């Protein structure tokens, strides 16, 4: 029996986001009617994404339809997030999948001297846990919050909280995409908005780990499954601006070398990186797969993909949850009069 399912994928225009959509379409029941809600900050990127997804759908056999919708949302703008909530609530009565693929950073370049030293002293570590990416410190959004904190953590969390009725109606699954680089060392609990951090991107992914750990049980009580994943290491389009043709292919060579000498995390292709996020959404058995674990996309030396799980150090999760919950209440109050009656259908 066919069903109608709705999937919202944030950051759809990224390498990982597109491949999450591809794999989701592949792994869904062929008779299901799917609606893919593409999200981006700009309309041209939305159109580009939808064209790519349509081309992919034309290469596979399925009896169910694939429909396309879009959502223009900027997770560093709370009014935009609230507008996204109203837009989705007006269009849909349920959401089945919500992928949090937010991955904004404030990079300013590469410490090339440091990179060369790392590559020669420890090549595997250099392409697994690099320390030579330069990130700006103290960058705030127009809302006055830490930009990376808002884009990758608080903004998506706020939207999910607003969409709980739709997720409940769809017996939905929320999939947080974290990172292999989300160790406790990247976050100070005295700097939850990451304004004093020179590793704000990694710190935001540590916050994702802790926020998931603090909330998945409550989500389960609502009939919503929530999983924590990471894509391993792959070629990300966002960092290409800092590479030339030589450094790009040098990076690829080191990625393949790392995989050959035994790293499970060098998936390299975005398609393989999307394995874990789509696996937990479509194939995970809620009676077997534990929501407190972190599910990673992994590959063997020959490129054969598999799922690798890790435990999460939850130290500080209640502190993070308390801080973000209080911040949500503050923004509820600030935004209560932002949506005008003209937005409500007559």
Curated annotation (Swiss-Prot):
One of its GO terms (molecular function) is 3-beta-hydroxysteroid 3-dehydrogenase (NADP+) activity. It catalyses: a 3beta-hydroxysteroid + NADP(+) = a 3-oxosteroid + NADPH + H(+). It is an enzyme of class 1 (oxidoreductase). NADP(+) binds at residues 16, 39, 45, 201, 205, 236. The keyword NADP applies. It holds the Pfam family adh_short. It comes from the Eukaryota. InterPro entries: Ergosterol_Biosynth_ERG27, NAD(P)-bd_dom_sf, SDR_fam. GO terms for biological process: ergosterol biosynthetic process. Keywords: Lipid biosynthesis, Lipid metabolism, NADP, Oxidoreductase, Steroid biosynthesis. GO terms for cellular component: endoplasmic reticulum membrane; lipid droplet; mitochondrial outer membrane. Its EC number is 1.1.1.270. Pathway: Steroid biosynthesis; zymosterol biosynthesis; zymosterol from lanosterol: step 5/6. The active site is at residues 178, 201, 205. Belongs to the short-chain dehydrogenases/reductases (SDR) family. ERG27 subfamily. This is 3-keto-steroid reductase. The gene is ERG27.
């Amino acid at each position: 029996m066919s069903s109608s399912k709705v999937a919202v994928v944030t950051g759809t225009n990224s390498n990982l986001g597109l491949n999450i959509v591809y794999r989701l379409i592949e792994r869904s029941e062929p008779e299901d009617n799917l609606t893919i809600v593409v999200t981006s900050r700009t309309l041209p990127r939305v159109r580009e994404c939808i064209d790519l997804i349509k081309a992919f759908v034309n290469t596979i056999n399925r009896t169910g339809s694939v429909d396309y919708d879009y959502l223009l949302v900027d997770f560093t703008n709370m009014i935009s997030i609230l507008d996204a909530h109203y837009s989705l609530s007006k269009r849909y009565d349920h959401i089945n999948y919500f992928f949090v693929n937010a991955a904004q950073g404030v990079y300013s370049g590469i410490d090339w001297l440091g990179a060369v030293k790392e590559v020669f002293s420890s090549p595997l570590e250099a392409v697994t846990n690099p320390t030579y990416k330069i990130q700006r410190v103290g960058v705030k959004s127009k809302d006055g919050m830490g930009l990376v904190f808002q884009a990758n953590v608080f903004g998506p969390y706020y939207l999910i909280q607003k969409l709980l009725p739709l997720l409940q109606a769809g017996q939905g699954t929320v999939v947080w995409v974290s990172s292999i680089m989300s160790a406790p060392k990247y976050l100070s609990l005295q700097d939850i908005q990451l304004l004093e951090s020179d590793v704000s991107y990694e710190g935001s992914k540590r916050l994702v780990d802790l926020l998931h750990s603090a909330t998945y049980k409550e989500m389960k009580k609502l009939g919503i499954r929530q999983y924590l994943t990471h894509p391993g290491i792959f070629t990300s389009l966002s960092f290409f601006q800092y590479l030339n043709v030589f450094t790009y292919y040098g990076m690829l060579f080191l990625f393949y070398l790392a995989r050959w000498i035994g790293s499970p995390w060098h998936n390299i292709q975005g398609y393989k990186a999307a394995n874990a996020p789509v696996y937990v959404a479509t194939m995970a058995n809620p009676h077997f797969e534990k929501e407190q674990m972190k599910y990673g996309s992994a590959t063997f030396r020959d490129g054969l993909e598999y799922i690798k799980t890790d435990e999460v150090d939850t130290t500080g999760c209640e502190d993070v949850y308390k801080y973000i919950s209080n911040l949500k209440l503050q923004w509820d109050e600030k935004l209560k009069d932002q949506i005008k009656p003209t937005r409500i259908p007559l």
